[in-house]
């Protein structure tokens, strides 16, 4: 066997449809485009969103809202996640580095601690932001809350 004798497996290739090569081929004459009209001509391409002259949906519906350029996006971390980290790693202080090491957040994200779940251990938590309920829950069990500066 050599490279010059290799052929594709039978049935794996398909011959392309040759249009406009006589009536006997089944694709002659109009070349599968039907008779006359804009869509039968060469170079035809319909404008995106064109609905045949009807007012298109993007013009019928009103404009609304906007994206704030000053939006600060946080990665939410619940207290239940903090508690599971304390249980598995026996930590007294939990910072952003610990969350990154555990694979919970990526290094370049801002972190906000939310009050989902319960926390039972005394712990010092460092993050960029805290919800009011999360902060109260951490302080209630005797822990401390440290806010770091936003990067």
UniProtKB/Swiss-Prot annotation:
This protein's record includes keyword ATP-binding: no
A Pfam family reported for this protein in Swiss-Prot or TrEMBL: Ribosomal_L27A
- Gly residues bias: where? 21-31
Region Disordered: start and end of each range?
Answer: 1-45
Q: Give GO terms for biological process.
A: translation
Q: What Gene3D superfamilies would the database entry show?
A: 3.100.10.10
Query: Which proteins does it associate with, and in what oligomeric form?
Result: Part of the 50S ribosomal subunit.
Briefly state the protein's biological role. Binds to the 23S rRNA.
Q: Can you tell me which family this protein belongs to?
A: Belongs to the universal ribosomal protein uL15 family.
S-S bonds: none
Which GO terms label this protein's molecular function in UniProt? rRNA binding; structural constituent of ribosome
Question: What PANTHER family is this protein classified in?
Answer: 50S RIBOSOMAL PROTEIN L15 (PTHR12934), LARGE RIBOSOMAL SUBUNIT PROTEIN UL15M (PTHR12934:SF11)
Q: Which GO terms describe its cellular component?
A: cytosolic large ribosomal subunit
Keywords for this entry? Answer: Ribonucleoprotein, Ribosomal protein, RNA-binding, rRNA-binding
Which InterPro entries does this one have?
A: Ribosomal_uL15, Ribosomal_uL15/eL18, Ribosomal_uL15/eL18_sf, Ribosomal_uL15_bac-type, Ribosomal_uL15_CS
For this entry, the protein name equals Large ribosomal subunit protein uL15
